[in-house]
Amino acid sequence: VDLYEKGGSYKLKVMEIYQAGAGRINEAFEKLKAELEEMGMFDACYKQKLPDYINRIGVVAAYPGEAVHDIVENATRRNPFIEILVYPAYVQGEQAPLSIVRGIDTLQGRNVDVIILARGGGSTEDLWAFNERMVADAVFNCPIPIVSAIGHEQQVSISDLVADMR
């Protein structure tokens, strides 16, 4: 920083510029997105249709939580006889990706018609577990249709892109 007292101005000398914060996160997101897109994991031909009649829903979400509350409230209002199985998962932090994958795997053996991945809104970092490769693979390879309900509408995760419905 140089100071010019006479004019009362400062001059900044920039020695280095680099992307920080969301830049690196966005770069990782775009890299994985491009890789999975090239593999065809977002292609419509792989999207499973939801059953016409849904009797049993599996939910992978933090429990208790607002996301689960909203799903239960809306589903039972439409069909008071619907069964909802909740797999309580970590949806944020280091343990979250494996916890989400275990939830998907567990619910596959519970005779559910559809699986909902749910997590309320948050920062990109808070939602990052749904951008991990292991979660994308579990969603893509699941024989049961998966609905992704992650974050706010304007937030898009890798899980949203791979899932059968968003």
Locate each region found by the language model.
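Short glycine/threonine-rich loop/turn motifs
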Residues: 54-166
